[in-house]
């Protein structure tokens, strides 16, 4: 059989990432609102019809109706209880990461020579937020250092950008709980990816612009100059009021310790609170409690009338590292269990008319000519809910499972997540207004920079519908990740750990070394993206050889060889989908080019 491939060889039948993405592109490129699918295919982006298979209410007897009502009440209580424990597990998870990484985070922030490099500042913001699992904690460190004159506002801007990127890791971790079902995982992971893609695209535009013009710094200065500011009351703490009774029985941390470590004023080497109050004069005691050594004393100050804290680790002799590992394992176990329960209960509750009503309310659009208004109302709703919860991580972690079960579409989740970015900066603004008078202006300027950064991102990637690039990119990423589930783990490791660490290491060597290595790599990636887009949209503009990637080794343009390698290393087959979902394909090139060629 003749072949157009080099060497007259037909490759082994595979389904690679290019085939999957190309199919998605063809579906999105049609003028109809319904995707064009091959025969026998189902569109995973279409919200599934959650049909009610139970017996109609009118046909039930009195006992059956009582059982139905009791079951509904129990499901509602189970859903609320699972959601409560899910939120508490996120709080404990954040405490665990702070115990494991806060000392490192504080030491990293001390190095002003490294922070003067914008790329290094960005990477440090990503790494620290990933370590402590809390954008509020990372922002508080930056605000404290700016107020203490250890950092300038200009140096803090790239760090704030990195904090914004690092906060999207939580929703990605949550989406992994739905990896058991291919379509649910595709929708859930695309929802988590759209948040990270938006943040990275905004950074790619604004970081060079800020380095050249100091745009965000000047905007924040103008806003401060035009406003009449007075200290306000402390920001509301709605969510903490609900979670504190449980989480404070597990562990309590010294919230000022991380900032003290970063500013060099640390007096106690342990983050765990052992004394929560005093009724007498304190007496000084020696402390040798370390992160990796035994604790001989709990605090550097021992009250005359001791009022010990009441939590599981109040009297522990374990190190911060050991306590952090215990909390990490326990919180992850509870988190995964609650997510499984939430997804199962949502699948059980959201049936028939209930599902239709919920979908209609969340995904509704206004009639023409006001159809564009629905997305902006979703932005406001996301900002308001995040402000009420005071946690963007909790809000995004709640949206992702709803996307997986088919309640929220990707097009509606996108503005909700953008609103969440705005909502978390509003909380920071109120917290800055509650700062002491001598620190209020510095804290407020950093909070305003965070706000303007997210607002600029919305103007860039949402205001003009044609520029809403994170949505198709997240769809394509979801297609590939659903086919090769191990890609999700690679994305987490590369996007939030390995690549930031590599960039940080190069920045330590110097700006010239970073530019010498990073410049060609970034240029190569941009060139590959440009050629790939032209292959699919305008292949006639390219030389014949560049109209496909078939001339490259298969492992450079297909994930199939890597999938076989991962499958051999993962005998439980968790990293790969069932064989029933695998289809055959005989080429990797652009189908428009090969349409007239004989294989």
Swiss-Prot record:
Optimum pH is 7.5. The modification Phosphoserine is found at residue 4. GO terms for biological process: intracellular phosphate ion homeostasis; phosphate ion transport; sodium ion transport; sodium-dependent phosphate transport. GO terms for molecular function: sodium:phosphate symporter activity. The keyword Oxidoreductase does not apply. Residues 98-111, 210-322, 389-445, 507-510 are extracellular. It catalyses: 2 Na(+)(out) + phosphate(out) = 2 Na(+)(in) + phosphate(in). Glycans are attached at residues 265, 268, 286, 299. The chain crosses the membrane at residues 77-97, 112-132, 189-209, 323-343, 368-388, 446-466, 486-506, 511-531. This is Sodium-dependent phosphate transport protein 2C. The gene is SLC34A3.
């Amino acid at each position: 059989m003749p072949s157009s491939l080099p060497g007259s060889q037909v490759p082994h039948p595979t389904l690679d990432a290019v085939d999957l993405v190309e199919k998605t592109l063809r579906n999105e490129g049609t003028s109809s609102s319904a995707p064009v699918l091959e025969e026998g295919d189902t569109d995973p982006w279409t919200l599934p019809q959650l049909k009610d298979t139970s017996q109609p209410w009118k046909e039930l007897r009195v006992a059956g109706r009582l059982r139905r009502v009791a079951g509904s009440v129990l499901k509602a209580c189970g859903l609320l209880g699972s959601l409560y424990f899910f939120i508490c597990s996120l709080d404990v998870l954040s405490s665990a990461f702070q115990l494991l990484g806060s000392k490192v985070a504080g030491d990293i922030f001390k190095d002003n020579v490294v922070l003067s490099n914008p790329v290094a500042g960005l990477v440090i913001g990503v790494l620290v937020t990933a370590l402590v699992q809390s954008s509020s904690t990372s922002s508080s460190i930056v605000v404290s250092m700016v107020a203490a004159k250890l950092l300038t506002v200009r140096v803090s801007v790239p760090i704030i950008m990195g904090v914004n990127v690092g906060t999207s890791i939580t929703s990605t971790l949550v989406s992994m709980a739905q990896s058991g079902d291919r379509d649910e995982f595709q929708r859930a992971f695309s929802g988590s990816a759209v948040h990270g893609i938006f943040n990275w695209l905004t950074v790619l535009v604004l970081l060079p612009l800020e380095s050249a013009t100091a745009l965000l710094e000047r905007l924040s200065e103008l806003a401060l100059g035009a406003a009449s500011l007075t200290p306000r009351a402390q920001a509301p703490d709605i969510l903490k009021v609900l979670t504190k009774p449980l989480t404070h029985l597990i562990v309590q941390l010294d919230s000022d310790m991380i900032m003290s470590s970063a500013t060099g004023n640390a007096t106690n080497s342990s983050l765990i609170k052992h004394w929560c109050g005093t009724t007498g004069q304190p007496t000084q005691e020696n402390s040798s409690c370390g992160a990796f050594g035994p604790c001989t004393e709990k605090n550097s100050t021992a009250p005359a009338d001791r009022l010990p804290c009441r939590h599981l680790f109040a009297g522990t002799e374990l190190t911060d590292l050991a306590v952090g590992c215990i909390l990490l394992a326990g919180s992850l176990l509870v988190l995964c269990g609650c997510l499984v329960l939430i997804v199962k209960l949502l699948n059980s509750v959201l049936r028939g008319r209930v599902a239709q009503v919920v979908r209609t309310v969340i995904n509704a659009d206004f009639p023409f000519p006001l159809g564009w208004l629905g997305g902006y109302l979703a932005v406001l709703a996301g900002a308001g809910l995040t402000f009420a919860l005071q946690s963007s991580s909790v809000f995004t972690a709640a949206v992702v499972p709803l996307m997986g079960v088919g309640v929220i579409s990707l097009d509606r989740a996108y503005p909700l997540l953008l609103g969440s970015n705005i909502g978390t900066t509003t909380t920071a603004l109120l917290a800055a207004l509650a700062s002491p008078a001598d620190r209020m202006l510095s804290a407020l300027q950093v909070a305003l920079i965070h706000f303007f950064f997210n607002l600029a991102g919305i103007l860039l990637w949402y205001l003009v519908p044609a520029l809403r690039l994170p949505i198709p990119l997240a769809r394509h990423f979801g297609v590939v990740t659903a086919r090769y589930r191990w890609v999700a783990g690679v994305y987490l490791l590369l996007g939030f750990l390995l690549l930031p660490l590599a960039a940080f290491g190069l920045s330590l060597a110097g700006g010239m070394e970073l530019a010498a290595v990073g410049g060609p790599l970034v240029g190569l990636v941009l060139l590959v993206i440009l050629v790939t887009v032209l292959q699919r949209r305008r292949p006639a503009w390219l030389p014949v050889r560049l109209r496909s990637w078939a001339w490259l080794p298969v492992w450079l343009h297909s994930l199939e060889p890597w999938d076989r390698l991962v499958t051999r290393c993962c005998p439980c087959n968790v990293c790969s989908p069932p064989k029933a979902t695998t289809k055959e394909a005989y080429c990797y090139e652009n189908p428009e080019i090969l349409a007239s060629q004989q294989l």
